């Protein structure tokens, strides 16, 4: 398991309608994967780059 507990949270797009490419850690595949973030109400499993995601998770 990742050391950062936020990495275990589910991917969360959020209620806003922006379309920002972001990354989250998929605990099932054990990889950082891209998703489209809505721009607000994120959880701790939300990273601007794949590199940030890999460092954290």
From Swiss-Prot:
Localization per Swiss-Prot or TrEMBL: Secreted; Nematocyst
Tissue specificity as recorded in UniProt: Expressed by acrorhagi.
Site features described as Reactive bond for trypsin, chain residue numbers: 17-18
PROSITE patterns the UniProt entry points to: BPTI_KUNITZ_1, BPTI_KUNITZ_2
InterPro entries: Kunitz_BPTI (IPR002223), Kunitz_BPTI_sf (IPR036880), Prtase_inh_Kunz-CS (IPR020901), TFPI/VKTCI-like (IPR050098)
GO molecular function: serine-type endopeptidase inhibitor activity
Main location: secreted
Keywords: Disulfide bond, Nematocyst, Protease inhibitor, Secreted, Serine protease inhibitor
S-S bonds: 7-57, 16-40, 32-53
Family matches, as Pfam families: Kunitz_BPTI (PF00014)
Task performed by this protein: Serine protease inhibitor that is strongly active against trypsin (700 IU/mg) and moderately active against plasmin.
Miscellaneous information on this protein: Does not inhibit potassium channels (Kv), as well as metalloproteases, and cysteine proteases (papain and bromelain).
PANTHER family tied to this protein: BPTI_KUNITZ INHIBITOR DOMAIN-CONTAINING PROTEIN, KUNITZ-TYPE PROTEASE INHIBITOR-RELATED
Protein name: PI-actitoxin-Aeq3c
Species whose genome carries this gene: Actinia equina
